[in-house]
Design a protein with these regions (language model features):
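A short beta-strand motif that forms the metal-chelation/ATP-contact edge
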Residues: 36-41
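C-terminal accessory/tail domains of diverse enzymes
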Residues: 1-33, 44-297
Length: 297
């Protein structure tokens, strides 16, 4: 109830102040503002943080997000990929998965004593972007138990691959999903035998709405099997907003559908900016999905 009241109030006050959580691009496409809807998870004190008390919880979240790329791309913003503000672990470096599996093996089982600094030491150099920036990561642990000082030892985890959705209830469904996943992995840790090697499939398949939807439905099925009554229909607005339909038509029983897809826009190397506050990207390419039904193979 508190989350509902606060989130709804925030959106209402923004609307009254003539602020919007959506915008339209030059070509008329309806999109998000680009503002982050980052979720910071933790406890009232570092000692209360579930990620310091149970580091296997963080391991479960990272591994589950890696197994289901739809969680990385469905809720993110316009800029995705290895040079974005929240790259996946397997987007940053090709060899990171092998090292991540070694890091996971260093996290003791549930019930054993775990020093609070251990999580930072084993994951700090892996949860980064291609330049080694620890802040630009899908799972940011800068404020978990950093050796830099007390301001970095708050027991907080920041999930950055979320853009501000246009409606308060869309944000609330995201929050509900995260809270349910934490409850699920607290009771039953997610420990795959081996992390998936997606390779080029990551951007060949999961940039398309068809594969994102199929993968996310698998997530919903697994949540239901774990005792959390989620429905994929709750996230239908997220799909329509993330992958708007351009149009469809039918010819002699054959149906065509054209829908927006995702495209990683990489940072350009020849464009500089004073102070480094601006990073130019190559947005010259866009991807679309063409889906055909009723055609003979």
């Amino acid at each position: 109830d508190q989350l509902v009241d606060q989130t709804t109030h925030l959106y209402d006050v923004a609307h009254v102040s003539r602020l919007s959580t959506e915008k339209f691009m030059v070509d008329g496409r309806h999109t998000g503002t680009g503002g982050g809807n980052h979720f910071v998870l933790g406890g009232a004190t570092p000692n209360d943080s579930p990620f310091l008390r149970r580091p296997d919880l963080l391991r479960s979240l990272i591994a589950y997000w890696h197994t289901h790329p739809s969680l990385s791309y469905l809720f993110s913003g316009l800029f995705i990929g290895p040079t974005s503000q929240a790259p996946r672990v397997d987007e940053a470096r090709n060899d990171s998965l092998y090292e991540l599996e070694i890091a996971f093996s260093q996290i003791p089982p549930v019930g054993e004593y775990i020093p609070p600094w251990l999580v930072d030491r084993v994951l700090r150099n892996l949860l980064t972007d291609v330049t080694g920036n620890t802040h630009r990561s899908e799972f940011c642990i800068d404020k978990l138990f950093s050796p830099d000082g007390p301001t970095g030892r708050l027991g907080l985890l920041e999930l950055r691959a979320f853009e501000m959705p246009p409606h308060a209830r869309m944000s609330l469904t995201q929050q509900l999903l995260l809270r349910a996943m934490i409850a699920r992995f607290w009771e039953e840790p997610y420990v795959p035998a081996r992390l998936a090697r997606w390779g080029t499939e990551l951007h060949d398949r999961f940039m398309l709405p068809f594969y994102v939807e199929q993968d996310f439905r698998d997530v919903m099925d697994e949540m239901q099997a774990a005792g959390f009554p989620f429905k994929a229909e709750w996230f239908a607005p997220h799909f329509e907003f993330r992958f708007p339909k351009y149009g469809d038509f039918a010819v002699k029983g054959i149906e065509f559908e054209l829908r927006h897809a995702l495209e990683p826009w990489h940072v350009m190397g020849e464009e500089g900016a004073a102070g480094g506050a601006v990073r130019y990207v190559d947005s010259s390419v866009e991807r679309v999905q063409v889906r055909i039904k009723g055609m003979a193979p």
